[in-house]
């Protein structure tokens, strides 16, 4: 089963414009749907909500209606899943509080995984597992050479042959957002070896 898709920004079809700088996030016409306090709040936070989007997709995959993006972001911030730094920067998603929230709020078994080779991901998906994987955001561009690994989260939900199937909440087109597919070796170039495994 392919999980329902949720993007970091509410207007999934306009994420490409937001990333290209031709549309300000504050001008996303669907921002009120997010639960943000205002357009400026939405613009400040949405770029950091890849983890929230992945958690929402993981809940939806299990038939659970997910909370609005900013309702979940506020809950996770309260739990330490996001940290607001004195300089205004936002740090997160921090995995352990997210795992605790999945358990406490929904009874979902999840665990933080580190030092996990890309080759081990298919085994984690067996039997309906999901993996929120840390990758470089350049994963949306086929053939791109990432300057580093990590910094962004995607929801890996399936395997087809040697391809990993995943949703990318900051994909800039339908093809790079929903059920994106990459060979395992190609995925590994972007992958930081860590994430959250859900059963």
Question: Can you name each region flagged by the protein language model?
Answer:
Residues 56, 137, 170:
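Residue-level signal for short, function-critical loop segments
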Residues 113-167, 198:
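Active-site-adjacent substructure of cysteine-protease-like catalytic cores
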Residues 52-56, 96-99, 118, 122, ...:
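Extracytoplasmic/secreted envelope proteins and their assembly/folding machinery
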Residues 1-88:
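Active-site-adjacent structural segments surrounding the nucleophilic cysteine of cysteine proteases
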Residues 81-114:
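Mid-length scaffold segments of soluble, non-membrane domains
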Residues 7-39, 43, 47, 144-148, ...:
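Noncatalytic regulatory segments and standalone regulatory/sensor domains
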């Amino acid at each position: 089963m392919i999980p329902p898709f949720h993007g970091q920004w509410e207007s999934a079809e306009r994420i490409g414009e937001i990333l290209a700088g031709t549309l300000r996030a504050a001008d996303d016409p669907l921002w009120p749907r997010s639960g943000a306090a205002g357009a400026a709040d939405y613009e400040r936070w949405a770029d950091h909500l890849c983890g929230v989007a992945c958690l929402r997709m993981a809940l939806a995959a299990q038939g659970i209606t997910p909370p609005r993006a900013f309702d979940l972001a506020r809950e996770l911030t309260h739990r330490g899943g996001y940290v607001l730094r004195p300089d205004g920067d936002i740090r997160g998603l921090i995995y352990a509080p997210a795992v605790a929230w999945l358990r406490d709020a929904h009874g979902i078994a999840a665990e933080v995984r580190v030092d996990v080779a890309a080759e081990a991901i298919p085994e984690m998906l067996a039997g309906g597992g999901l993996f929120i994987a840390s990758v470089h955001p350049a994963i949306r561009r086929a053939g791109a050479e990432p300057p580093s690994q990590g910094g962004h989260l995607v929801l890996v939900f399936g395997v087809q042959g040697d391809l990993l199937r995943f949703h990318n909440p900051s994909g800039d087109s339908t093809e790079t957002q929903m059920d994106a597919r990459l060979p395992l070796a190609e995925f590994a170039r972007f992958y930081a070896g860590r994430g959250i495994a859900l059963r």
